[in-house]
Amino acid sequence: DRIVAATQTGMRAIVIGANGRVGTRAADLCAAMGVAVTKWDQAETASGGPFPAVLQHEIFLNCILARPGCPVFVPASAKTDPRKLTVIGDIACDPTSDFSPIKVYDRVTEWDAPALRVAENPPLDVTAIDNLPSMLPVESSEDYAMQLLPSLATLTDLEAGVWGRARAD
């Protein structure tokens, strides 16, 4: 309900990982709904944080591939810190990892109960469904096909290119 209300109240979303497939689509969805979008990627997070700007958006969509050394975007203190943030969509969904960039929750959510309330005043809800990126099967299939097609086109020469490198000794 709050996301729908965002289109009428001038809420803002921040998408981190905005240059990737999932982040691009997340930003597109927000824009299509009339939600103002701040797009961040590696350049904007290279400083390592902290990132108080994340807490000044009402919606945060995490679309990164978290790895060791990943900065924290939402610290545990965000539950009680002054903030505008009320909705987190952790599309990357890696809450139990030591390098999760979102420290306000510790478990995935499910389709039958997609939101987890982690703070009350103001409310802060997290959606973290571990198979959510699979909702983009067409985009994933097209991207995979475009990556595979050049290799398939050289299948007639098994000694060259990727086929030659893949050959067992």
Task: Specify the residue positions occupied by each region the protein language model found.
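Glycine-rich phosphate/diphosphate-binding loop of Rossmann-like nucleotide-binding domains
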Residues: 1-64
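Adenosine-phosphate binding glycine-rich loop
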Residues: 1, 93-169
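Generic secondary-structure signature for well-ordered alpha-helical cores
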Residues: 27, 31-35, 66, 149-160
